């Protein structure tokens, strides 16, 4: 098994409810190490740039508005098969379809306010990590 890194974002709906610690505990219980973490408030330009792949989708404007509505916690998670493991811990994008005891099933408010973002591939993880972190900010 390969040690990988993936990006996680704890979204404004979760930071507003002080769920950062509870969500971090889920990652750590699953064997993922938090090797980079910062709390910030995304600018409109940052959110638009990060979600640029969705620019032509109907939900793009509301997604950017939501992601800039409050603080987020951006994180680099590391572990064996980190991308897949993180996606399993998060649960399905739509919390109504998420498995029991996943972050989204337990904490999400809606399909948009679903508490967390996670990279969907190792390639995207590398790109997303570089978007928010310099190599010197990641300490394994």
Curated annotation (Swiss-Prot):
Source organism phylogeny: Bacteria, Pseudomonadati, Pseudomonadota, Alphaproteobacteria, Rhodospirillales
Short name of any one Pfam family annotated for the protein: NDK
Entry's localization field: Cytoplasm
Entry keyword annotation includes Protease: no
PANTHER family for this protein: NUCLEOSIDE DIPHOSPHATE KINASE, NUCLEOSIDE DIPHOSPHATE KINASE DDB_G0292928-RELATED
Gene Ontology CC terms: cytoplasm
Protein's gene: ndk
One GO BP annotation of this record: UTP biosynthetic process
Subunit structure, interactors included: Homotetramer.
Protein name, per record: Nucleoside diphosphate kinase
Active site: 117
Cofactors required: Mg(2+)
Species name: Rhodospirillum rubrum (strain ATCC 11170 / ATH 1.1.1 / DSM 467 / LMG 4362 / NCIMB 8255 / S1)
Gene Ontology MF annotations: ATP binding; metal ion binding; nucleoside diphosphate kinase activity
